[in-house]
Amino acid sequence: MARIAGINIPEHKHAVIAIQAIYGVGPTRAKSICAGAGVAENTKIKELDEATIDKLRDEVAKFTVEGDLRREVSMSIKRLMDLGCFRGIRHRRSLPLRGQRTKTNARTRKGPRKPIKK
């Protein structure tokens, strides 16, 4: 298996789809990575030689992906919580951030219903 950015890339998939297994690489970025490395989008990973995979690694390294991106996102959320702004408070309380109603909805964010103890 080819390893790019510390992730095992599925070899039986096309290059554009396989690169999206990396956290932080979506469809648009995957196409630009393939174009920058000179890889056809419909080429399967197992058909690529080691030099081409190295080119893909170099293209992926230009972006913030995987652990660095996860750390960046978590630090951004932590900063909001430390500031005590509205979004930070909503993060701390595990409630929706963007003005959605919470009286009847928001079950995903709030978790399962808790029964009222008598």
From Swiss-Prot:
Point out the signal peptide segment: none
Q: What superkingdom heads the lineage?
A: Bacteria
* Keywords, comma-separated and alphabetical: Ribonucleoprotein, Ribosomal protein, RNA-binding, rRNA-binding, tRNA-binding
Record keywords: Lipid metabolism included? no
GO cellular component terms listed in the entry, alphabetical order: cytosol; small ribosomal subunit
User: Region Disordered: what ranges?
Assistant: 94-118
Q: Which GO terms describe its biological process?
A: translation
Family annotation (InterPro entries) = Rbsml_uS13_C (IPR027437), Ribosomal_uS13 (IPR001892), Ribosomal_uS13-like_H2TH (IPR010979), Ribosomal_uS13_bac-type (IPR019980), Ribosomal_uS13_CS (IPR018269)
Entry's Gene Ontology molecular function annotations: rRNA binding; structural constituent of ribosome; tRNA binding
Among Pfam families, the record links this protein to: Ribosomal_S13
Q: Which NCBIfam families match?
A: uS13_bact
For this chain, the family text in UniProt reads: Belongs to the universal ribosomal protein uS13 family.
Fetch the PANTHER family from UniProt: 30S RIBOSOMAL PROTEIN S13/40S RIBOSOMAL PROTEIN S18 (PTHR10871), SMALL RIBOSOMAL SUBUNIT PROTEIN US13M (PTHR10871:SF1)
> What HAMAP family has UniProt attached to this entry?
Ribosomal_uS13
What this chain does, per the record? Located at the top of the head of the 30S subunit, it contacts several helices of the 16S rRNA. In the 70S ribosome it contacts the 23S rRNA (bridge B1a) and protein L5 of the 50S subunit (bridge B1b), connecting the 2 subunits; these bridges are implicated in subunit movement. Contacts the tRNAs in the A and P-sites.
Quaternary arrangement and interactors, per the entry? Part of the 30S ribosomal subunit. Forms a loose heterodimer with protein S19. Forms two bridges to the 50S subunit in the 70S ribosome.
Q: What is this protein called?
A: Small ribosomal subunit protein uS13
Annotated organism of origin: Alteromonas mediterranea (strain DSM 17117 / CIP 110805 / LMG 28347 / Deep ecotype)
